[in-house]
Amino acid sequence: MTLRNKAFHQLRQLFQQHTARWQHELPDLTKPQYAVMRAIADKPGIEQVALIEAAVSTKATLAEMLARMENRGLVRREHDAADKRRRFVWLTAEGEKILAAAIPIGDSVDEEFLGRLSAEEQELFVQLVRKMMNT
C-alpha cells in the first residue's frame, strides 16, 4: 500500500472509529445535527443557509435534516416576512435541553480521540488538516 493510500485509509478508519463511538454515546443525534444545533445555540435565529458549513452538507441535505429536526421538536424555523425564500432557525426548549445534555458527552468523545495527542500535536494536526483542505 502506498503512503498516500495508507494515509487516507487510516483517516477513514479514524473517522469510522469516531463515528461508531459517537453513535454509541449519542445514538439519537448525528454529528452533523449536533454541529448544527451548536451553531444555532451560538446564534439563535441564524439564517438557514448559514448552517451549511456547520452541517458540512449541501443546501438540500441541510433542509432535509432541519425538517427532520423540526419534526422531532428540536428546532423551529420561520420564513422572512419580506422574502419567503429566507428562513431563520432557533432551537426549541426541547432542542436546548437535548443539546445541553449532549455537549459534555460529545466533548468527551472528541477528547477520547484528541486526548491521545499532546496539545502541540493537536495544534499541528489541525494545521495539517487545514493545509490539506486548502483553507
From Swiss-Prot:
Q: Which residue intervals define the domain HTH marR-type in the entry?
A: 4-134
Keywords annotated in UniProt: DNA-binding, Transcription, Transcription regulation, Virulence
Superkingdom, according to UniProt? Answer: Bacteria
Whichever gene encodes this chain, its name is hosA
Name the Pfam families on file. MarR
| SUPFAM superfamilies per the UniProt record, alphabetical | Winged helix' DNA-binding domain
**Which terms does the record give in the GO molecular function aspect?**
DNA binding; DNA-binding transcription factor activity
User: Mind listing where the DNA-binding region sits, in residue ranges?
Assistant: 48-71
Q: What is this protein called?
A: Transcriptional regulator HosA
